[in-house]
Amino acid sequence: MTEPTGEHDRGAPRRQDDAFEWLVDEPMLHEPILVVMLTGWIDAAGAADAAADTLSKECETSPILRFDDDTFIDFRARRPVMELRDGVNTDLVWSTIELRAGRSSSGRDILVLTGPEPDMAWHRFARLISDIAVDLGVTKMIAFGAYPFAAPHTRTPRLSCSSPSTDVLANVTFARSSVDVPAGMA
């Protein structure tokens, strides 16, 4: 995270909600980009999750906000993973959705939202993400996903993009498609 340098820097957000918890006092960010990768529906072969993990490591992100798991995750459908070693329960890992902050090698502040796609309260979750993004001064949001596509492994994978903005699409050279599919959270 960067030191404050101008009018677009954002200090400690004051938004509070019982659906999330701030893990830091003052995340100082300058016009960050928000990258969203929620595992679940749209992540063929775990490609998008691997991309988000790589980005998080390269930008040396650390958690700044954690969502309340009981509010958004159905643990009957997404059970915690119990680690057993020689019959001893050594750990219990719960799914969690968190927002991490870091900086790219070019000095750009990056926010990475990771975890499982919410099982419930999608409208509330979307509003919270939108409000938090505004509070933190986010200038752009990018969602990672990977659709399954029948293509030989000998071919270069195709990248595609979608956006609610025709202005954004005018500035990218990725393939565009027309299709009706079940939507993911991101």
Positions of predicted regions on the chain:
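Flexible, glycine/proline-enriched loop segments at strand-loop-helix junctions
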Residues: L38-I42, V112-W122, V172-P182
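Catalytic cores of processing enzymes, dominated by hydrolases/peptidases
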Residues: A150-A186
